């Protein structure tokens, strides 16, 4: 049975005097029932079991709450409440079952939740254990088909990070305000024989943590910062990173920007060897990219005051290096590999695959490049067509950048980043573009770490993914990148903003695609159209095309002039199905 967690607002206000959640909607946590996975199928993607576990649970310096608090918290209810950290609860938000590992994950937390025992708060100067999100939370997928759960390492997760943080916030406030909950919580954190001084200290720290969270929440809501509920499988990544860096870390609420450009969680295989990454082709240096990502999911930094230019931060640089090494490997295609169509899915039609291969070369390869086999052969060529080199001697895949106006897809993700500016405050650069500001901060954190570690030039180059130290690392242009489509069958929904539910619908004309109602959050996989089940279900996310950033326009196949959303000729239904079959084979 699907469940809806509705907090009893009147009773809670009377008993607890909760002021951070004045509206009923803010006291609701609505999730689907836990989607129990079937038999776990792990595909060959170039990783050992130990490497999978490393990716799932390596800390990158982010913080949700202190670790012992997280384990002690109960779910947001009144009586008979189970632990917040229970897999069956967090799984309702889309978190996948984690790996058992005495060092990395001793308490069996889900994939993408990581324990860090030496988190260093740059504001307070304190060091303590925390639980935080890692990149695996958003970049590990799972497709349910019949009685199988097919794990996709590096694929987009069908999870809802903002809703779980909302639930966490409500659980914290309930714990503070309801005496019987707080007593149980304090005993779990401190033990039954804690001193009065320890109890007072916990009470003070807990209260201060919640007051800061309430204050921040009130400011975010008063500015209507996130009007588009991204829902399952999406987040407004660049806006959130900018808000955490330019707003939170710089201590300047006027630097916060409204987030109207949610994007789906992208696949991350091969991307370490692209010339530029992000949907808008905005970041080159992998270390800069990963520092920005960590800051966006609540790694702490202090970029204000007389010590602003010291770039004090909590980013776990060794953790980022471990994660990046897993993804990239020593050479292209030697790290995390894209998944192959699994044997538990219906077998591919060889004749359709062959027909689709010809169609792909005609209509897709011009933007998305040829097959991986051809790219690998080109990598070893003396005069490669698709790869470029720099002073390190390494080769990088030179992806095609397409103007927003030409591909015709929703432009907010690219255009908002181009238009955004930030007051650099105590960093002393005045008002600058978001791209310049993000490079200033991420390179500042990177270079401070290099200096303290005493790195040689060779070590710096390795840590930067063999990019050049003084090369442009962040840019902002009105473009989207076209990447190779190996593994594309495993990354629904489609387009950068997840507005097209299946591969079949990606190959449509404007009229054929339309604006069909579909729902996000169901992990049941449709191997025919290639996408998740689209039907309405309680607790799911209804995709609303009327919201800013949610258009499914562009990338149409229809006759007429190319450009302004048209990328290829009209395809017969037989050709569409042949292309779908070929894309399954990549």
Where is each model-derived feature located?
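Core hydrophobic alpha-helical transmembrane segments of single-pass membrane proteins
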Residues: 8-16
